[in-house]
From Swiss-Prot:
Xref: Gene3D superfamilies: Phosphotransferase system, lactose/cellobiose-type IIA subunit
Protein name in the entry: PTS system cellobiose-specific EIIA component
Main function: The phosphoenolpyruvate-dependent sugar phosphotransferase system (sugar PTS), a major carbohydrate active transport system, catalyzes the phosphorylation of incoming sugar substrates concomitantly with their translocation across the cell membrane. The enzyme II CelABD PTS system is involved in cellobiose transport.
One GO BP: phosphoenolpyruvate-dependent sugar phosphotransferase system
Domain PTS EIIA type-3: 2-100
Source organism: Geobacillus stearothermophilus (Bacillus stearothermophilus)
Residues at the active site: 76
Modified residues (Phosphohistidine): 76
UniProt free text on domains: The PTS EIIA type-3 domain is phosphorylated by phospho-HPr on a histidyl residue. Then, it transfers the phosphoryl group to the PTS EIIB type-3 domain.
InterPro entries: PTS_IIA_lac/cel, PTS_IIA_lac/cel_sf
Highest taxon of the lineage: Bacteria
Residues in the signal sequence: none
A GO term for molecular function: kinase activity
Amino acid sequence: MQTYEQTVFQLILHGGNGRSYAMEAITAAKKGEFAEARRLLEQAGAELQAAHGLQTALLQQEASGGQPVVTLLMVHAQDHLMTAITVKDLAAEFVELYEALKRQTTES
């Protein structure tokens, strides 16, 4: 069983990985590598899903009567995760945008 701190660090790890994959997806799309961009977005999604699972476990623990421990590290982890989710959502939009721009320039 993981300790509370280990769980918090796992949130940070998966959030950071998800954000990194999302940023790499934007870079790939900018180069016209759309299949790679979509693959990277899927990896970002998998990382963020893992983080969400950890977050859900913490919420269930609190809902079943466990006392929540709110440390600065936990606040940082939650901020890190929410930022990563936003970056992933925006990255998906960027990939679509770069793909549309590529189609427009090849049709012209």
